């Protein structure tokens, strides 16, 4: 299965936001964080960066997206999603390999501590947990 990659377009904003909101709603601890503020912050960040997201396509259909960028001299994978119903088919592995091919050095990411499936995925692909990132999240790194 071959994936192709391109920059996101404005018309994909709602789909990317839906994935981000699903993740926040599932794993965020709303006892510590105001839900509407958390979702508003996600919306602002994604709207600002939409054209920096990479869309993965299979046979012309968008199957996932990621946002890889430099933060204070460190490469971070800030968002990474395989769209339903394409999960569990090796697409995430191919997408992460694409991210790794674009970086000379370490990739950092934050993941919700409760997102056991994602943590396992990242560990299988060479990431390790480096510590807490705050707000119920963990830092992970792959060199």
Report the location of each language-model feature.
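Active-site acidic-Proline motif in GNAT/NAT acetyltransferases
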Residues: 83-85, 89, 113-114
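Extreme N-terminal starter segment of soluble prokaryotic enzymes
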Residues: 2-4
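Acetyl-CoA-dependent GNAT
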Residues: 7-79, 83-84, 96-98, 102, ...
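Conserved GNAT acetyl-CoA-binding A-motif
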Residues: 102-113
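Conserved active-site alpha-helix within GNAT-family acetyltransferase domains
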Residues: 93-94, 114-132, 138
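Glycine-rich acyl-CoA binding loop
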Residues: 88-96
């Amino acid at each position: 299965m071959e994936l192709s990659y391109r920059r996101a377009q404005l018309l994909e904003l709602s789909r990317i936001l839906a994935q981000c909101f699903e993740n926040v709603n599932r794993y965020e601890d709303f006892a510590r964080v105001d839900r509407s503020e958390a979702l508003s912050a996600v919306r602002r960040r994604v709207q600002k960066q939409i054209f920096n997201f990479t869309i993965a396509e299979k046979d012309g259909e968008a199957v996932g997206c990621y946002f890889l960028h430099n933060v204070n001299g460190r490469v971070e994978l800030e968002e990474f999603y395989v769209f339903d119903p394409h999960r569990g088919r090796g697409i995430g592995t191919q997408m992460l390999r694409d991210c790794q091919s674009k970086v000379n050095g370490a990739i950092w990411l934050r993941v919700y501590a409760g997102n056991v499936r994602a943590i396992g995925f990242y560990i299988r692909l060479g990431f390790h947990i480096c510590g807490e990132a705050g707000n119920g999240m963990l830092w992970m790194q792959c060199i």
